[in-house]
Design a protein with these regions (language model features):
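The feature marks the mature, well-folded catalytic cores of soluble enzymes
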Residues: 1-204
């Protein structure tokens, strides 16, 4: 029985961390954050509330990251700044410079939750959670591209290999350019232990 996480992307959620968008997205500039012309912070807040309600109704406990007017608009996407294993969390380093400070929020939250931190990706390495996919409990695929580089993959491998976890790097297609930011999870969505929804034309 794991104490801190699950090395699976198909099992039911039991505990998650989330952040409210109300304050952090209120003043977000569309062009700066690449949100597109249809971005509406009020609507984003409403939709996030519905999403959080669905997560809670699924039976998962939600721990809320400290709220604040810190301008970290993307911090509501809590999957990216850290990776949780059965033994604890790994603090990642964001490839999008506007998101670098989000990792400290995750570190603070894990400390409050008594979740141990196994390591941290340091410069010049970058790894974002959206580029990490658990193939099985002992295999982590990591997409190398705009937001995750080889130095980050090497550091992540050094942290996880002592736990018996193989880290497999793969090249991601650029597709529509760097600003579009294609993550590995944009291509692969695990549905069950032996089933995934994939976009074959872009599959590494």
């Amino acid at each position: 029985m794991s104490a801190f996480g699950s090395q699976s992307m198909a099992l039911p959620l039991k505990r998650v961390i989330m952040r409210l968008p109300d304050r952090v997205m209120a003043g977000a500039e569309r062009d700066v954050w690449h949100y597109g012309p249809q971005f509406d912070p009020r609507k984003a807040s409403e939709q996030h509330s519905v999403f959080a309600d669905l997560v809670a109704k699924s039976g998962a406990d939600i721990t809320w990251i400290r709220d604040g007017n810190d301008g970290l608009s993307d911090s509501i996407f809590t999957h990216d700044p850290s990776l949780v294993t059965d033994k604890g969390a790994v603090l990642l380093r964001m490839g999008k410079s506007l998101r670098l400070d989000e990792t400290d929020l995750h570190e603070e939250t894990y400390r409050e939750m008594n979740v141990p931190v196994l390591g941290r990706i340091e410069a010049p390495g970058t790894v974002e959670g959206g580029d990490c996919v658990w193939v099985d409990s002992k295999t982590l695929a990591v997409g190398r591209g705009v937001r995750t580089n080889q130095s980050g993959i090497d550091q992540l491998r050094a942290i996880l290999e002592p736990l018996g976890i193989a880290v497999l790097g793969c090249d991601l297609p650029l597709w529509q350019g760097e600003e579009a930011c294609l993550h590995l999870m944009s291509i692969i969505s695990p549905l069950a232990e032996d089933l995934a929804l994939v976009h074959l034309p872009l599959l590494p």
